[in-house]
């Protein structure tokens, strides 16, 4: 049986070195890798040209390399400026849409006005009827309280302010 690998034989061709010289490439082959490193896939030798230029992924004129067709109003602008303008336009549209949605939510209900028949005094009267158990007109005075050695009667309003004055810290 022939143990020769046809791929390996390709690299042993008499003209192989000459082809590398013509193409001006360097063949990088990994062997005897560190045990802690793993391969996801072995893609064989890499052929790299001898002369390489650094590829910068981001520059002010980054889109120049991509050669997007641009509108006349966009010509001469940097990638950053074009990006900001596109975001500003999108943000403006989003803002307008959200305002429209909020407007619709607020004003989507029935648009009508009602008039109070027989005068505006009906409004507080009807409110009073709905909450009258919570309103206390002419409440009884609180029981007599001792204040500074004498018995004094206070209205609720007077007592509230008097008790605050008694409990207020010095210098207040």
Swiss-Prot record:
Expression across tissues: Expressed by the venom gland.
GO cellular component: extracellular region
Catalytic activity: an L-alpha-amino acid + O2 + H2O = a 2-oxocarboxylate + H2O2 + NH4(+); L-leucine + O2 + H2O = 4-methyl-2-oxopentanoate + H2O2 + NH4(+); L-phenylalanine + O2 + H2O = 3-phenylpyruvate + H2O2 + NH4(+); L-tryptophan + O2 + H2O = indole-3-pyruvate + H2O2 + NH4(+)
Residues annotated for substrate binding in this entry: 47, 103
Top enzyme category: oxidoreductase
Recorded superkingdom: Eukaryota
Binding locations of FAD: 44-47
GO BP term (any one): killing of cells of another organism
Modification after translation (UniProt): N-glycosylated.
Keyword Repeat belongs to the record: no
EC number: 1.4.3.2
Thermal dependence of activity, per record: Optimum temperature is 50 (Cc-LAAOI) and 60 (Cc-LAAOII) degrees Celsius.
UniProt activity-regulation remark: Activity is increased by Mn(2+) ions. Inhibited by Zn(2+), Ni(2+), Co(2+), Cu(2+) and Al(3+). No significant activity change by Na(+), K(+), Ca(2+), Mg(2+) and Ba(2+) ions. Both isoform are completely inhibited by L-Cys and reduced glutathione. O-phenanthroline, beta-mercaptoethanol and PMSF completely inhibit the enzymatic activity of LAAOII, but have no activity on LAAOI. Iodoacetic acid inhibits the enzymatic activity of LAAOII by 46% but has no effect on the LAAOI activity.
Stated pH dependence: Optimum pH is 7.8 (Cc-LAAOI) and 7 (Cc-LAAOII).
Segments passing through the bilayer: none
Subcellular location: Secreted
Cofactor(s) the record lists: FAD
Known partners and oligomeric status: Heterodimer; non-covalently linked.
Function: Catalyzes an oxidative deamination of predominantly hydrophobic and aromatic L-amino acids, thus producing hydrogen peroxide that may contribute to the diverse toxic effects of this enzyme. Shows high specificity for L-Arg, L-Met, L-Phe, L-Leu, L-Tyr, L-Ile and L-Trp, low specificity for L-Val, L-Ala, L-Asn, L-Gln, and no specificity for L-Pro, L-Ser, L-Thr, L-Cys, L-Gly and L-Asp. Exhibits diverse biological activities, such as hemorrhage, hemolysis, edema, antibacterial and antiparasitic activities, as well as regulation of platelet aggregation.
Protein name: L-amino acid oxidase
Taxonomic classification: Eukaryota, Metazoa, Chordata, Craniata, Vertebrata
């Amino acid at each position: 049986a022939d143990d020769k690998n046809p791929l390996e034989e390709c690299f042993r061709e008499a003209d192989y070195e000459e082809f590398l010289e013509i193409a001006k490439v360097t063949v990088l082959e990994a062997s005897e890798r560190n045990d802690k490193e793993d391969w996801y896939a072995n893609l064989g030798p890499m052929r790299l040209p001898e002369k390489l230029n650094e590829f910068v992924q981001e520059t002010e004129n980054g889109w120049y390399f991509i050669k997007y067709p641009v509108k006349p109003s966009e010509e001469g602008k940097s990638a950053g400026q074009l990006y900001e303008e596109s975001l500003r336009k999108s943000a403006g549209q989003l803002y307008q849409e959200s305002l429209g949605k909020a407007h619709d939510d607020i004003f989507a209900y029935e648009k009508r006005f009602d008039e109070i028949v027989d005068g505006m005094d009906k409004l507080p009267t009807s409110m009073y009827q709905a909450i009258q158990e919570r309103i206390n007109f002419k409440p009884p005075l609180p029981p007599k309280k001792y204040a500074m050695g004498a018995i004094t009667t206070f209205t609720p309003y007077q007592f509230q302010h008097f008790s605050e004055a008694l409990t207020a810290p010095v210098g207040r």
